[in-house]
Amino acid sequence: MAKYKVGMVSLGCDKNRVDSEIMLGMVQNEYELTNNPKEADIIIVNTCGFIEKAKQESINTILDMAKYKTSHNCKLLIATGCLTQRYGDELLELMPEIDIMLGVNDYAKINEAIMNFINGNNEKVKATNYSDVSINEGLRLITTDKATAYLRIAEGCDNFCTYCIIPKIRGKFRSRALESIVEEAKKLAENGVKELILIAQDTTNYGIDIYGEKKLHLVLRELAKIEGIEWIRVLYCYPEAIYDELIKEISVNDKVCNYLDLPIQHISNNVLKRMGRKTTKEEIIGKINDLRKNVPNIVLRTSLIVGFPGESCEDFNELKDFIKTIKLDKVGVFTYSREEGTPAAIMEDQIDEEVKKAREEEIMLLQKEVSEEINKNKVGREYDVLIEKFNGEYYIGRSYEMAPDIDGCIYVKGNGAKKDQFCKVKIEKALEYDLVGVVCNESCK
């Protein structure tokens, strides 16, 4: 009997991608995988439920995939992820197209749920409460480029920012054991991974729950010992939780990219307080200055929310001044999304959508000018570039200054470049967010 074919659509962030990779790793031994939904007997949609735009995309994708039940081979539609965890039975009632629903802690049940359905048991699985589940990544099927993989070091969040639903979806902060992280990293390296990207809802507080103190610096130190790993990149660092030992480890460890993602969200003390952030403008700027002083050529990325309830013109102007004067290397901007079940959703002084959008565009225009200025100063410099693909004209890769998907890239000319290899590249031209360079002779490895 031919194996059933399983297809998956993974939505949302890189943490969701890891969840999808875990599920694919589990089902690949029992079923045949396909990227073509027209061929799939079973379709899994791993949803995002963080903000309104993501929720709508998830719902639309489920409905799109449900059409293959009548037009093609699909016999079973499974919804997983944050949207299912957040809405549970309510989602099942609203979307009868879903045959099986699994929450963010139920991925170990994926094969059992599929088999039960095949055997005639049509009971819809319910989402499990996060407190019943420990962190265990298991075998993953990596979906990124061969040389790069995300490595989750913790799950959940204890920060409870007033705009954020994640603690209710993903649960309390739980660190993985260091031994588990290192073991998975070694397996990734054996399979050709050269860049590890450390992720969690909050990477900087790693270890505080299981070791009694922050241990991210120790994670970096141990991962750097693994043969084959060349770059270690850290995302989702809360600035108020960055500590001296971590800064020192980044500065002295050659394998740790001089790159940090600091999701500050805003700079006005008024807005930070309403957001429930545990820091101030002065502390954020102080931390940025510390990092720039102690880590040579560090690249700093942040994400910002504009249009938060009560954000006055003065607050917004303060944010604009911050963009113009501090000149962070990379900035992502989001308009505030009013999420039911969060304290911010019932705050007074909600901002009109038109104002939010205008503020988003204004910040991005300012950051575009900053980015152009920063990139122009890179012309003539040489970088180690990890080559990821060839588009027919250029090789495309990234330097240590660029995380995949969220930052720019380097278009590389010249002979000798190879996919999944590092090449020394000299920058010849600066674009708004990207760079153009040429391979230095005999430089690829």
Curated annotation (Swiss-Prot):
It comes from the Bacteria. SUPFAM superfamilies: Radical SAM enzymes. Residues 4-119 form the MTTase N-terminal domain. It catalyses: L-aspartate(89)-[ribosomal protein uS12]-hydrogen + (sulfur carrier)-SH + AH2 + 2 S-adenosyl-L-methionine = 3-methylsulfanyl-L-aspartate(89)-[ribosomal protein uS12]-hydrogen + (sulfur carrier)-H + 5'-deoxyadenosine + L-methionine + A + S-adenosyl-L-homocysteine + 2 H(+). Pfam families: Radical_SAM (PF04055), TRAM_2 (PF18693), UPF0004 (PF00919). One of its GO terms (biological process) is tRNA modification. Its EC number is 2.8.4.4. GO terms for cellular component: cytosol. It is found in: Cytoplasm. Transmembrane segments: none annotated. GO terms for molecular function: 4 iron, 4 sulfur cluster binding; aspartic acid methylthiotransferase activity; metal ion binding; protein methylthiotransferase activity. It is an enzyme of class 2 (transferase). This is Ribosomal protein uS12 methylthiotransferase RimO. It comes from Clostridium perfringens (strain 13 / Type A). The gene is rimO.
